[in-house]
Structure formats: structure tokens, C-alpha cells
């Protein structure tokens, strides 16, 4: 019997504001594709401006998935993302279309493409119960600070109020001596799909200028009012509000910063995030990079995907 044919998946990654959205839609049109968002924050309804969510007009008729599937007060795990996206890949493939994952949340995308297992093993029950007691007696922030000390990557990703996941990460470190993030990465990295992994990059100063401009545009489009709406709904201490673009403006509404300082901090945090994204993708994934400093490379990228995945575009003769 022949080898089972793996599903074909195109993946477009890159830092915030580099131009992934337009490229992905152009590619989807050319390759008969449908788009899956690989951004961990675009899943939240009513959080449109701050997450730079693709608009209906920009979609131009191309189906998009993993957008507006959760309320801002809901939590969302890497494991749930993995399960949902893999289901979308199957369904898109069954319709004879090409799944195109677009995004910037590296661990989430990696969890889909590779054979990662997320388990809730029995672990150390006594240790877990002790942490639960500490959370009750001394507060969730205290337990979260303990995680920050041993596994800052997980602490940044998991909100303090998500006590179960905070304690799970602490428990993994306690029982194995490894960070949760390291344990995930140590698993056998077998690609589950036939993947074309495209990365967009550009001159750093140009990228930072684009990020600053994007933040100014977000403010003009009504980011302040968008965040105020969440604030007035009483949404506090949720995973969604940890997103860049929201936590900074929350500081303004809670009188911890002036609006000018909040916007300045938003720009700084966005630039730092872009730098972290690039570092993460370069260190963790085998990406073919295209420099778009001098303009888009849609035709070149299209030819690359055609060759890598052995698919034909609508532009092919």
C-alpha cells in the first residue's frame, strides 16, 4: 500500500504590520484557498481594532476561520486552538480548497503543524492542592508570581485568573524540572502536513515606522472607544485584556497612565512584540523568508508555493 498523502497547508507568518493580511487574500484568490487565522487574539468578538482584525471588505469573499469565536471574558488554550484548526484544515481540504494559515502567534501555529500532545496527567495531586490553597489564602497574583519566577514564558501567556492553568504549569516544573514551554518543544517534532511555510520580513526601521503608524490609525478608527466598551462591560483580569492594544489603554481608564503615555507604551510594546515574533519564528521553525522592504512579492511567493506543494494557481497556464 502507498503512503497516506498528507494534507497540503500554506502558512504565512511574520511580525505585526508586515503585510500578511493582503498577501494571504491575494494568495487565497490565486490558489483557491480559504484562510485560517493563526492569531490568538482575533478569536475574540468585539475586539476588532486593537487586534487589527481583517474586515469583511478586506476579505473580499474569501472565507476566514478562527475569527470572532469567543467572548472577551472566555479563556482559550493552545490545545483548543490546535483541535479547532486541525478540524478546519480537514474540512477545507475535503472541499477541494487549500487551507492557508495566517498569523503571528508562534506557539499556536506550531502546535497545529507538529505532532504535539497536550495532556492533563495525574501529576502531583498534593502539590496541586497546596497551590490551590495558596491561591485561596494569598490570592491568584501570588501564585502567578511564583510561575513568573520559574517559567516567565508561560506566565506571560497564562492570565493570573486562569488558576488551573497557572498551577498546571507550576506542577509541570515541580515534577519534571522543565518549563511547560520547554516540555512542549521537546516532543517529537513531526510535521503532520505537507507544509509551505512562508515568512515575511522587512527593514526593521521601516517595520517600526509601520507599527507606529498603525497604532495612530487604530486610535483614529476608535480603539479608545472599543476598549472603553469592554471596560464598561466590567471585563477585567481576562486573558483577552492581556493583548497588546488593550492592556495599555486599560491603564488609561484605571488612571495609571495618561492617554498620551498609554499610546506611547502601546507603540513600544508593539515594536517589542514584533521583535520577539521574528526571533521566535527564526529559532523555532524552518521558514522560507521573503523580504518585502521594497514592495510585495506576491508573484514570487505564489511560484514558491506552487513548487513546494505541487499545486496550480489560477494564474498558471
Curated annotation (Swiss-Prot):
Substrate binds at residues 16-21. The record marks 105, 128 as: Interaction with substrate tRNA. Pfam families: IPPT (PF01715). Its EC number is 2.5.1.75. It catalyses: adenosine(37) in tRNA + dimethylallyl diphosphate = N(6)-dimethylallyladenosine(37) in tRNA + diphosphate. Keywords: ATP-binding, Magnesium, Nucleotide-binding, Transferase, tRNA processing. Residues 39-42 are annotated as: Interaction with substrate tRNA. It comes from the Bacteria. InterPro entries: Dimethylallyltransferase, IPT, P-loop_NTPase. GO terms for molecular function: ATP binding; tRNA dimethylallyltransferase activity. The keyword ATP-binding applies. Its cofactor is Mg(2+). ATP binds at residues 14-21. GO terms for biological process: tRNA modification. Monomer. Belongs to the IPP transferase family. PANTHER family: TRNA DIMETHYLALLYLTRANSFERASE. Catalyzes the transfer of a dimethylallyl group onto the adenine at position 37 in tRNAs that read codons beginning with uridine, leading to the formation of N6-(dimethylallyl)adenosine (i(6)A). HAMAP family: IPP_trans (MF_00185). This is tRNA dimethylallyltransferase. The lineage of its organism: Bacteria, Bacillati, Bacillota, Bacilli, Bacillales. The gene is miaA.
Amino acid at each position: 500500500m502507498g503512503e497516506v498523502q498528507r494534507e497540503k497547508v500554506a502558512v504565512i507568518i511574520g511580525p505585526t504590520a508586515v503585510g500578511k493580511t493582503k498577501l494571504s487574500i491575494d494568495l487565497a484568490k490565486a490558489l483557491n484557498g480559504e484562510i485560517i487565522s493563526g492569531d490568538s487574539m482575533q478569536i475574540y468578538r468585539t475586539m476588532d481594532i486593537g487586534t487589527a482584525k481583517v474586515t469583511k471588505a478586506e476579505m473580499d469573499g474569501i472565507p476566514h476561520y478562527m475569527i470572532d469565536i469567543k467572548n472577551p471574558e472566555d479563556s482559550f488554550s493552545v490545545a483548543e486552538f490546535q483541535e479547532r484548526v486541525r478540524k478546519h484544515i480537514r474540512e477545507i481540504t475535503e472541499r477541494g480548497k487549500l487551507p492557508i494559515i495566517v498569523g503571528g502567534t508562534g506557539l499556536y501555529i506550531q502546535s497545529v503543524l507538529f505532532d504535539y500532545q497536550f495532556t492533563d496527567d495525574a501529576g502531583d495531586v498534593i502539590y496541586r492542592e497546596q497551590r490551590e490553597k495558596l491561591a485561596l489564602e494569598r490570592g491568584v497574583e501570588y501564585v502567578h508570581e511564583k510561575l513568573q519566577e520559574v517559567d516567565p514564558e508561560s506566565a506571560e501567556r497564562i492570565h493570573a485568573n486562569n488558576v488551573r492553568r497557572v498551577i498546571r504549569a507550576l506542577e509541570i516544573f515541580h515534577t519534571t524540572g522543565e518549563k511547560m514551554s520547554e516540555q512542549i518543544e521537546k516532543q517529537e517534532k513531526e510535521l503532520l502536513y505537507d507544509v509551505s511555510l512562508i515568512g515575511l520580513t522587512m527593514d526593521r526601521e521601516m517595520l517600526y515606522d509601520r507599527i507606529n503608524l498603525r497604532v495612530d490609525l487604530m486610535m483614529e478608527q476608535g480603539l479608545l472607544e472599543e476598549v472603553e466598551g469592554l471596560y464598561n462591560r466590567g471585563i477585567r483580569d481576562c486573558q483577552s485584556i492581556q493583548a497588546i492594544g488593550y492592556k495599555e489603554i486599560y491603564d488609561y481608564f484605571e488612571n495609571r497612565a495618561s492617554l498620551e503615555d498609554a499610546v506611547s507604551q502601546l507603540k513600544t510594546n508593539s515594536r517589542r512584540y514584533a521583535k520577539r515574533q521574528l526571533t521566535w519564528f527564526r529559532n523555532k521553525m524552518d521558514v522560507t523568508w521573503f523580504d518585502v522592504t521594497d514592495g510585495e512579492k506576491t508573484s514570487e511567493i505564489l511560484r514558491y508555493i506552487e513548487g513546494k506543494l505541487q499545486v496550480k494557481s489560477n494564474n498558471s497556464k
